[in-house]
From Swiss-Prot:
Its cofactor is FMN. Residues 1-379 form the FMN hydroxy acid dehydrogenase domain. Pfam families: FMN_dh (PF01070). It is a peripheral membrane protein. Its main location: membrane. It is found in: Cell inner membrane. CDD domains: alpha_hydroxyacid_oxid_FMN (cd02809). This is L-lactate dehydrogenase. The active site is at 275 (proton acceptor). Its EC number is 1.1.-.-. GO terms for biological process: aerobic respiration; lactate metabolic process.
Amino acid sequence: MIISSSTDYREAARRRLPPFLFHYIDGGAYSEHTMRRNIDDLADLALRQRVLKSVGTVDISTTLFDEELAMPVVLAPVGLTGMYARRGEVQAARAAEKKGIPLTLSTVSVCPIEEVQAASNRPIWFQLYVLRDRGFMKNALERAWAAGIRKLVFTVDMPVPGARYRDAHSGMSGPNASLRRIIQAVMHPTWAIDVGLLGKPHDLGNVSAYRQQKTNLADYVGWLGENFDPSIGWKDLEWIRDFWKGPMIIKGILDPEDAKDAVRFGADGIIVSNHGGRQLDGVLSSARALPAIAAAVKGDLTILADSGIRSGLDVVRMIAQGADGVLIGRAFVYALAAAGQAGVENLLDLFAKEMRVAMTLTGARSIAEISPDSLVRGL
């Protein structure tokens, strides 16, 4: 099929993947209103086209946490990425390195920290959840630092897992889930051979390394779900701030008061995020939450944003709203599932091209020149 956008990669991924995997990455919480608003609210932000602004060259590079990026895009942490392509986290890390940006490795990746970092000459970022098992958290941090990772993304919007109705219907969970997944795999032989057989081991690499025993999909649902800690507060995170010597980025901020708390805590950055609409349905989209947060803490720390970003135009929109950069999750996983490393590389090329076109037509020659004036106000 012809690939010209992330939407095309989504369709290609749908064709290739067993339904339980496609709907796991494609779905959101409850009735998925917030997931849809993430996309729609970004699309509703009208770019302000300008003409004759002498935009001879456009520079989309930027610097985040003293790290130079070819464009203000980071691959977001996505659990089970290694189930979407053979050793998927490794392929994603290589694609990101080739295009001059970092991958953020999920706590619950299939490939462990050491395997992924060894595959890339560029230091990846690492994402960690707040978990009851502090021993696991400390072990993961120590291993990440030893591997050369210096950027920590700390996810705080998951004290309990969100209810994702699609998972029960698709076979990720629900009655006879294991049998349903096997049947689906048999009906998708290309994936079954390439990933199901040749992509083993299919365990949670970082969890297995800590527990010194193999893990599986049941552990992803069981062990992880049992370890989320709703009692956590900012004070409980102080040991991590003291332990981790590199930049620490708090992921899951939707309210200006929480952003101010992150500043007081000493975070180096925040990620304005609703977990892609996968946690609490009915909350603000990231695009709508971002302006008030930027007004509250811009200049005090680095502001990143995710959720709903499907194109380079969306990147420009988020930056115009006050973000310093963005993370993309679903979009790159669709591309990875459809075409592996080459798919992610092509997707990032599409994002870069779309950014350059949008910046040229709004009169911005650099990331620094993207501002609220790049959008039409009052709409």
